[in-house]
């Protein structure tokens, strides 16, 4: 990140989590929250041209001058959300469900306030599949099928939460109940629209977790997310309508969500 900032100016953001597909495919396990907290500190200090204590030594990039790097934390579970509020510059929520987003954003903000931080200084990013389609039952069914893989992917993290906290935790039931029929996950199909083992994910979950439909529906949902405090949306395009979705976002969705600026007032 410091190298990229040196080359192209301060335009990078570090997104970090405990680890999923990259570590599980190599038979590893997600890291601990303690290690995550320490990693955030080390990465942020080095990425901001500052010295940091690491393994008994003081480290710094001698060539780095004036680099600026925010670290955004991806999280789902209560303790990870608490950590995010305590030390993260931003929060990455990998789903677009309005109710879950409201609960998680509030949890992160409360954790920030509890340690004396200003929650308004935290960025909130929602990352989820976006698919532009027609307002017909056939198109709706196709969009849902193309994005069902996402519910399976999120289900990995949800399964970890249920294992750790149980079914009766503070985590919203809308996030945990749907994995009851989950029997496993094949990372060879990770993030693919033709994932063949996500039948347990109901249509309703796909609708809630993703942003689907006409341009007007996308705009309406993104405006609701913005009202909850979301400051950035990162759309996934793992489906069969990439170009059209991108075109409509560029021509219609983004302009509708961007405050107008006049050249002369």
Task: Pin down the residues of each PLM region.
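A short acidic, helix-capping loop that chelates divalent metal ions and anchors anionic groups
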Residues: 22-27
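Short, flexible active-site-proximal loops enriched in glycine and acidic residues
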Residues: 7-17, 48-55
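Short, acidic/polar
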Residues: 75-86, 214-224
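Well-ordered beta-strand positions
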Residues: 45, 89-90
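Structural motif
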Residues: 7, 86-87, 228-230
